[in-house]
A protein has these predicted regions:
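Fe(II)/2-oxoglutarate oxygenase catalytic core
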Residues: 1-113, 121-156
Length: 156
């Protein structure tokens, strides 16, 4: 998980840019799927302000099939996860993400944002390039409001 030092203006600004960009992507996703928000608890979704920033060396990657929903009680409240996102920070041939049930592969292209359901309907894994490194940011979109989440976080 990325821990942003709020006293470091550069890292704080980078975090905010990423969250704002994903929030804009979420708005577009919901514009294309108007019923999606309506069926969520509280009819609200928000981009979790905690996310992962991962750099994989050549030959490394998350090869295991997985989904992003779980019932653990960690600080990111995974039981509230509705959507997951991946932001590719560089272009890497023969990398990206593959989705099992959809039999679909997304190439790793710098600036590309993927938003997809976090549950078992979208089991996925990373594709690994043996000669180039890959950097991605990944996170989640939860049901509810950011304000409610931050309130719960401050009380824990």
């Amino acid at each position: 998980l990325v821990a942003i030092d709020r006293t470091d203006p550069e890292s704080c600004a980078l975090s905010e840019v990423i969250v704002r960009g994903v929030s804009a992507g979420l708005d577009r996703y919901l514009d294309e799927r108007p019923l999606f928000r309506e069926v969520c608890p509280d009819q609200a979704l928000f981009v979790l302000p905690i996310f992962n920033l991962q750099r994989y060396a050549p030959g490394e990657g998350f090869r295991q099939w997985h989904c992003d929903w779980t019932i653990s009680d960690e600080v990111t409240e995974p039981v509230h996860r509705v959507l997951a996102w991946i932001l590719y920070c560089d272009t890497v041939a023969e990398a990206g993400t593959e989705f099992h049930w959809q039999q679909h592969h997304e190439e790793a292209v710098r600036g590309k944002l993927l938003i997809f359901p976090a549950g078992p309907s979208h089991i996925h894994r990373g594709r690994v390039n043996r000669t180039h490194s890959k950097t991605i940011a990944t996170g989640w979109i939860n049901a509810g409001t950011r304000e409610g989440y931050l309130r719960r976080l401050s009380q824990s």
